[in-house]
Amino acid sequence: FARTKWCGKLECERKMKELAGVSSRCMPLKQSGTEGVCPVCGKALESVACTGLRCGHPWLDSVLVHANGETCASQSPLPVIASDTVYLSDCITGMRRMTDESVDLIVSDPPYLINYATGHRQDKAHDFCTPIQNDSNPELIQKYVEECYRILKPNCAFYMFCSAKTQDFFKTAAQNAHFTVKNAIVWVKSEWTMGDLKAQFGQQYEVLLLLNKGRAPFNGKRLGDVWEFPGIRGRKQLHQNQKPVELIQRCIEKHSKEGDVVFDGFMGSGTTAVAAVRMNRHFIGFEIEPRYFWIIHNRLCEEVQHHAPCLL
């Protein structure tokens, strides 16, 4: 079940589906009226559409994708926070409804605090010129890591991406929340950043902090702290800062077991949820932007169909 706000115009609905690549088998079910703003045209509204997306897969019908824990009047009340669920909500509001020590692993790609917005010319496949929400909000990061410490079980791990420029702030925020910084893993990508093309060398890596609450032993053999995974570009890219599924799978593999709950407060295009499904883990997440919320739903539809047929 998915809930999002739009103005009710067919052209706005089509635009949202184009942005997300929502397949034709995901059908809108009903509408309800409250106040809101259309995420496509930006118009202030008196009515809001409550759009349910159903793919015909029994497991996905139980994987709830909705906003702020609400349901239509015809639906029964939902649990406060359910596993195998992505919520259209800001992470802090949502996490405060989660119980203490309720997740086994956290993998997150929060805003890097660098006011990122790509300068690349828009093409038919992407619309990445919109700035990332909360990308200049250090208070959010501090609150987030504090909430992460609260909901994470003892002796478990938290992987958090950050940029080379801001990693000191992220480390300090984590330590202030009582995490132990175990590694600053270097993720080597296949492409360079743009920047000053005449006076600055292209940056080809991002930082992935490995944090522990207590002491979290890893699974399997010991790895080095330089990980090489190709970045995502072209039509396969659904989010301007999208991470490879294989990279997230490595994090999940090293610090969780089958059946564990993996949390991500900044779901983006849903890569953490997709990786969790592939690794036979449960997931909980939040995403604040409606257009990526649609993308998450569609990716989970495809993931269950192609990689987890036992869940159908």
Roles of regions detected by a PLM:
Residues 1-23, 47-52:
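BZIP DNA-binding basic region
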Residues 9-14, 28, 40-43, 52, ...:
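Short Cys/His-rich local motifs and their 1-3 flanking residues in nucleic-acid-associated proteins
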